[in-house]
Amino acid sequence: MSVVPVADVLQGRVAVDSEVTVRGWVRTRRDSKAGISFLAVYDGSCFDPVQAVINNSLPNYNEDVLRLTTGCSVIVTGKVVASPGQGQQFEIQASKVEVAGWVEDPDTYPMAAKRHSIEYLREVAHLRPRTNLIGAVARVRHTLAQALHRFFNEQGFFWVSTPLITASDTEGAGEMFRVSTLDLENLPRNDQGKVDFDKDFFGKESFLTVSGQLNGETYACALSKIYTFGPTFRAENSNTSRHLAEFWMLEPEVAFANLNDIAGLAEAMLKYVFKAVLEERADDMKFFAERVDKDAVSRLERFIEADFAQVDYTDAVTILENCGRKFENPVYWGVDLSSEHERYLAEEHFKAPVVVKNYPKDIKAFYMRLNEDGKTVAAMDVLAPGIGEIIGGSQREERLDVLDERMLEMGLNKEDYWWYRDLRRYGTVPHSGFGLGFERLIAYVTGVQNVRDVIPFPRTPRNASF
C-alpha cells in the first residue's frame, strides 16, 4: 500500500478500492451515535481535507480516535471509496489510525477550529499556514513562482542569481539597510570623526540590496535575456498594506530591447501566470472568490482577455485633469501618479490594464534612458484594475555621457558605479527591463488586501518576529 497526498485521493488519481495511507493533521472530528467517527484530514497538498470514516471496532478507537482534536497529526490507512455524502467525491474507510502527535492543550491551541482575524494570525505566523486562508495563499504563491520560472525559460531567458549584499543604491533613494560587523559600542572613526567603514567586514559601507537590476544588466549584456528573482530590502518606515521591508522582486532584463518590447513582455508574462494559477489552483481560487474577494477569479479572466491600453504620461495627466474627479492628491505635470490616479485610469477611463509611458525624468531613477525632449525618460508602469501599479520598468540609459550627467544631477558619485559605467564603455547596447513586486502580484491574484498576509514571515517597521 502506498503513501499518497490527499490531493491524489480527492482528485481521482487513486483507484477506488485501493489501499492507501495519508499523513496529515486533523481539521475536525465528528462522532455519530452509531459508533462511527469522521475525521477531516488535511496535508496541505490541496485546499480540501479528505474525510476518513473510522469505525469503533478499531482497537485504539476509544483510547486515541475519540481524543483527537484540531491540529493533532495522524497517519490514516484504509480503502478509497466513493463517498455517499455531500461535499466530497471520495473518502477513506479507515482500517488503521496512528497518532503521530497530540495537541498538548486543545483549549489553548491558537489554531482551534474557529475563524480568526487576519491581525491575530500575524501574531502566530508560525502556525497560520495551518489555516485555510494562509494555506491557500502559500499554494498560490508557489504556483505563481513556478509559472514565472516556466514562462521565462520558455522564452529563452536565463535565471541569474544577484547578490543580496551590495555597495550600490539602485534607486538612489538611500532607504537601505546597512550591513556591518563593526562593534556598535566602539565604532572606529576616521580623521573627520565619521565611522571608518574601511575597518568593516567588506572594507566599505555595504547594504542589503534594494534591487538586483544593476547586477542583472551586466549579465543581460552577455547572455542577452536574463531575469533575477529573489528577496530585496527597503528601510522605508511605511506602515501600509502595500509595503514590506523585505519582499521578493522579479526583474527581467533584455539586451537590444526598447520600451515597447518590454511592455509586450510584461503583458505576455502576466497573462501567462494568471492563466496558470486559474488552471492549476482552481480549488484555492474558488475559496478566494467565495471568502475573500468575489471578483478574484473573474478579475483574472478579464485581465487575460483584455487588450492593454497604452498612454503617455503627459496624456494621462490631461485625462486626470479633465475627468471632473476631485482627487485627494493634486494632479499636475511632473507629479508622481498616486494609487488613486492609477486606479482611475485603469478602472474607470480605460477599463483595462494600462501601460503609462515616458515619465518626467525628475521623478524617475538615474538609469532610465533620457528621451529626445530632454524632459522625460523612457519609463513605463503597468497599471492593473483593482490595484494600480503592478510593474515598473524602463529602457536603460546606454550612453555613458548622458548616464554620467544624470548621476551628477542626482548627486550620485559616478566612481561608486564604475563597473556599471563599464557596460557603456565596452560594447554598449540598448537594453530594457522591469521589476515586478511578487507580493503585490499575489495580493492582486488572491484579493488579500495586505501584503503582510501573502509572505510567510512579514518584515515591517518594529516587527521582525519569528
From Swiss-Prot:
Keywords assigned: Aminoacyl-tRNA synthetase, ATP-binding, Cytoplasm, Ligase, Nucleotide-binding, Protein biosynthesis
InterPro entries hit by this protein: Aa-tRNA-synt_II, aa-tRNA-synth_II, aa-tRNA-synth_II/BPL/LPL, Asn-tRNA-ligase, Asp/Asn-tRNA-synth_IIb, NA-bd_OB-fold, NA-bd_OB_tRNA
GO molecular function: asparagine-tRNA ligase activity; ATP binding; nucleic acid binding; protein homodimerization activity
Keyword Protein biosynthesis in record: yes
GO process annotations (BP): asparaginyl-tRNA aminoacylation; tRNA aminoacylation for protein translation
Family affiliation: Belongs to the class-II aminoacyl-tRNA synthetase family.
Protein name (Swiss-Prot/TrEMBL): Asparagine--tRNA ligase
Species lineage: Bacteria, Pseudomonadati, Pseudomonadota, Gammaproteobacteria, Enterobacterales
